[in-house]
Amino acid sequence: MAEVKVKVQPPDADPVEIENRIIELCHQFPHGITDQVIQNEMPHIEAQQRAVAINRLLSMGQLDLLRSNTGLLYRIKDSQNAGKMKGSDNQEKLVYQIIEDAGNKGIWSRDIRYKSNLPLTEINKILKNLESKKLIKAVKSVAASKKKVYMLYNLQPDRSVTGGAWYSDQDFESEFVEVLNQQCFKFLQSKAETARESKQNPMIQRNSSFASSHEVWKYICELGISKVELSMEDIETILNTLIYDGKVEMTIIAAKEGTVGSVDGHMKLYRAVNPIIPPTGLVRAPCGLCPVFDDCHEGGEISPSNCIYMTEWLEF
């Protein structure tokens, strides 16, 4: 009598147990897991059962669907964001997750299209829907004024996007920067003059002429000339322009931890300096910087005899 082989089918796993195991794996790997990881951990579960469990977790808003270089990733969803995306389809959740991962630097729609692999028309529709729900917002970037980046609605855009204190509605505030430049230099000049008037030895005078970036920042804040809140980093940017102009020099000293104005045990000090070489006469005269220099000649519409800039300079 021939031997009869009977194929033993594994018992059907409880769908709830499969879902719980997938969630446990996601907690073990916070950055996300692939379908291969789930398959390796649960080899007895058929592909159809895995797909049903994953789709159910996605529909309940317990998992995020991400796309990486290696394929799709499943990541445990933040409980705070789960309620926000309730009722959204998987494509909308994917776009939201991509924007969330971009942080406060935002992401262009072109990059969203690349990461999601969705048609541009579908992405535009999803973006409008998310904007109407006030889940995301579009922000113009100073790097490319005609392009918008998308970020979560409650985020404050990064300085690289807005340009920081030096930009207003994507326009560079040159006059504001110039005023800050003058006031910072004025403060350091005053500090240097006070040191010279002390009549102490040269080394003490030199050390007394230095001011920390925190002192300069405090002085500017007390003047009240800025409508926006300036950080020490903003003031150091202004001080750097004075260094490039040859008006200020900087030195770095060691400082005790916790000292006001110190960073990582170091402190930046600045002082006003006199130029080593005086500027040439041509640079000081209006002709050296005149925007219509090439059109200026005697007998012409623009000439030295009727130059308003030369008249003002001579009267000064």
Curated annotation (Swiss-Prot):
InterPro entries: RNA_pol_Rpc34, RNA_pol_Rpc34-like, WH-like_DNA-bd_sf, WH_DNA-bd_sf. The keyword Nucleus applies. One of its GO terms (cellular component) is nucleoplasm. [4Fe-4S] cluster binds at residues 287, 290, 296, 307. It is linked to Immunodeficiency 101, varicella zoster virus-specific: An autosomal dominant immunologic disorder characterized by reactivation of varicella zoster virus (VZV) infection in adulthood after primary childhood infection with VZV. The viral reactivation manifests as central nervous system vasculitis with stroke-like episodes and lacunar infarcts on brain imaging. Features include headache, hemiparesis, impaired balance, and other neurologic signs. The [4FE-4S] cluster-binding domain adopts a globular structure that serves as an interaction hub that connects the POLR3C/RPC3-POLR3F/RPC6-POLR3G/RPC7 heterotrimer to the Pol III core. This is DNA-directed RNA polymerase III subunit RPC6.
